[in-house]
């Protein structure tokens, strides 16, 4: 009897062990995943990205749908190209999607992502962001630097006047980059730092650093191939550049500490003043301060310059829009001097021109998110840790939203399309939306409008000297995840005699 019981128990145990995986397979509901294109072993769908990922992802979405699942190596990637799902991510489930994926560049330049742009959502991140939004980039602070912006734009227009008087060409791309960098330097550090001023070329240092954020690293997606990044030398190169940038910014902070200004005159002074305030609950050290400064340079230099560069490109391609804008500017700025910010505030068509440039050429065409927990989107199961890419470039060229002429440059459309920058609007997201909305919108727009108004009022523009022909700049894009011109915008300015 005892042997029978032992045999029965063993049989039951073996049956249970054998049937458990089978029962689990039967009873467990298989997750419902979005459509996916066929992928290769090891690399997944990486081979399908191409030189301009926003365009290639858009092409794939036309075939597989506005919600599709790709695999970049071992990493699952959800690509979103429709406004309703974008709204779910940035509004309905904004808290679940408040994080951003990390990368090797973020780990090196931003200490693993402890800054405002890439930091994980939480109390520390909210406190650090408030330093930028409440103390540094609020409307009052942006307006306080009005004279500074007008001074630097005067420097730019004087250079253009010199080129005009000698019929010389100008690298407008480089000039706009210098403008934005010099303004950010003065606002952040207290003065300009460039080769012309006899100092370090901070512009080149920032631009070289920024380029790494758009590069592909094997280790980010295929850990077993991380050694390729190491032997290529890119790791050491990033660390070397980051060390130079950190040393420079640290020396700037120390210079301000030694000066001990009683009245703050720039961002470093303000941050040091906040740091001394014992009533503040959030405490930050020197490394946190340097990360905030990096955020200011990385997010403010190239993006604003690129916006202006593309807008000038489109205006030169559409002389009727250039003329309409010139007429509006001259109707409010009736003197022969530079346009002021107070005059710019009255110009509605100028606002439309800026918005149309951002719609067609967003400097950040792909918005990245990382869900902190499992979530359902349109009936599909999305696992925590899935990388999410919102194709803002595709959203802002969607014919269902913008009409059949969605790919055409037409600033007038913004007179009746009431899509704002500050709202969580999933159809127009050049600065992102939700908790990850870019805090520097006000700074960028004020500078873009003022610079563009002066470029258009003071000068006429040609690609070449001679008879007017097919004198239009191209729209070729550089390779990478940012939408930048492939070739610099080389132009011939001439004084516009309008009064």
UniProtKB/Swiss-Prot annotation:
Its main location: membrane. It is found in: Membrane. Keywords: Heme, Iron, Membrane, Metal-binding, Monooxygenase, Oxidoreductase, Transmembrane, Transmembrane helix. The keyword Heme applies. GO terms for cellular component: membrane. Heme binds at residue 438. The chain crosses the membrane at residues 3-23. One of its GO terms (molecular function) is oxidoreductase activity, acting on paired donors, with incorporation or reduction of molecular oxygen. Pfam families: p450 (PF00067). Gene3D superfamilies: Cytochrome P450. Signal peptide: none annotated. It is an enzyme of class 1 (oxidoreductase). The keyword tRNA processing does not apply. InterPro entries: Cyt_P450, Cyt_P450_CS, Cyt_P450_E_grp-I, Cyt_P450_sf. Its cofactor is heme. It is a single-pass membrane protein. Belongs to the cytochrome P450 family. PANTHER family: CYTOCHROME P450 71A2-LIKE, CYTOCHROME P450 FAMILY 71 PROTEIN. This is Cytochrome P450 71A27. It comes from Arabidopsis thaliana (Mouse-ear cress).
């Amino acid at each position: 009897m005892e042997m029978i019981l032992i045999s029965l128990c063993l049989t039951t145990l073996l049956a249970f062990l054998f049937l458990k995986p089978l029962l689990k397979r039967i009873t467990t509901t298989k997750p419902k995943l979005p459509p996916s294109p066929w992928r290769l072993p090891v690399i997944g769908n990486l081979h399908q990205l191409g030189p301009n990922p926003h365009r290639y992802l858009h092409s794939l979405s036309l075939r597989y749908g506005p919600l599709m699942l790709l695999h970049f190596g071992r990493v699952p990637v959800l690509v979103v190209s429709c406004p309703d799902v974008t709204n779910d991510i940035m509004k309905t489930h904004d808290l679940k999607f408040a994080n951003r994926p990390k990368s090797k560049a973020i780990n090196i330049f931003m200490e693993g992502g402890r800054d405002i742009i890439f930091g994980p959502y939480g109390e520390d991140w909210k406190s650090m962001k408030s330093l930028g939004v409440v103390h540094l980039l609020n409307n009052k602070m942006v307006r306080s630097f009005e004279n500074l912006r007008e001074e630097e734009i005067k420097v730019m227009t004087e250079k253009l006047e010199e080129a005009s008087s000698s019929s010389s060409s100008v690298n407008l791309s480089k000039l706009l980059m210098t403008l934005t960098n010099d303004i950010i330097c003065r606002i952040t550090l207290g003065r300009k730092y460039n080769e012309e001023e006899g100092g370090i070329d901070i512009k080149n240092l920032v631009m070289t650093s920024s380029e790494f954020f758009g590069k592909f690293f094997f280790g980010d997606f295929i850990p077993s191939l991380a050694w390729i990044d190491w032997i290529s030398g890119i790791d050491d190169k990033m660390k070397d550049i980051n060390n130079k940038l950190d040393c420079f910014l640290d020396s700037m902070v120390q210079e301000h500490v030694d000066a001990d200004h009683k009245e703050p005159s720039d961002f470093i002074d303000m941050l040091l003043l906040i740091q001394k305030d014992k009533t503040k609950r959030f405490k930050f050290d020197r490394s946190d301060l340097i990360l905030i400064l990096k955020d200011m340079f990385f997010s403010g230099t190239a993006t604003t310059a690129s916006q202006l560069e593309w807008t000038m490109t489109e205006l030169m391609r559409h002389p009727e829009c250039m003329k309409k804008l010139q007429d509006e500017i001259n109707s409010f700025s009736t003197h022969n001097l530079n346009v002021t910010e107070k005059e710019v505030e009255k110009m509605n068509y100028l606002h439309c021109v800026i918005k149309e440039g951002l719609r067609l050429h967003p400097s950040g065409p792909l918005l990245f998110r990382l869900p902190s927990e499992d979530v359902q989107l349109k009936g599909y199961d999305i696992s925590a840790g899935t990388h999410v890419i919102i194709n803002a470039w595709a959203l802002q060229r969607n014919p269902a939203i913008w009409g059949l002429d969605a790919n055409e440059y037409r600033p007038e459309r913004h007179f009746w399309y009431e899509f704002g920058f500050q709202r969580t609007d999933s159809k127009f997201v050049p600065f992102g939306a939700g908790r990850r909305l870019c805090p520097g919108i006000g700074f960028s727009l004020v500078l873009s409008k003022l610079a563009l108004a002066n470029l258009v009022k003071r000068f006429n523009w040609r690609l070449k000297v001679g008879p007017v022909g097919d004198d239009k700049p191209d729209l070729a894009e550089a390779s990478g995840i940012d939408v930048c011109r492939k070739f610099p915008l080389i132009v011939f300015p001439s004084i516009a005699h309008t009064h």
